[in-house]
Amino acid sequence: MLFSSDEALSFIFPCNQFGGQAPGSDAEIQEFCTLKYNTQFPQMKKSDVNGANELPLFTWLKAQKGFEGFGSSPAALMMKGMLAVSRPDYKSTPDIKWNFTKFVVDRAGNVAARFEPTADMKDVRKLVEKLIG
């Protein structure tokens, strides 16, 4: 865990909208995340993050921080290429583009940042450290 629970909270919202990467039950997904990523924070029920059935939380998060790009890393170039074929309009919508998109919300409830799955976790950690200062 990056931070103690009194400093920051992290939540996992499994979603099967991205290449069918989370087809299992909530229990199976939790076991996978615990074994593969050593997650030690709450996992919510599998949910939609885009579309007609998306959780209202994600409607709000995306309205606060829309998509700003993937950056220029090799992973970003791969993501851009994949989405250019499967979703040519991907740049023009606030939709979540792929699993592991992260939103940082400060203590006052403001969305401080959106990090795409291509973002370096060091950047996420740096922002959270600044916010919990």
Protein language model regions, located:
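Sec/Tat-exported extracytoplasmic proteins
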Residues: F3, L61-K65, I132
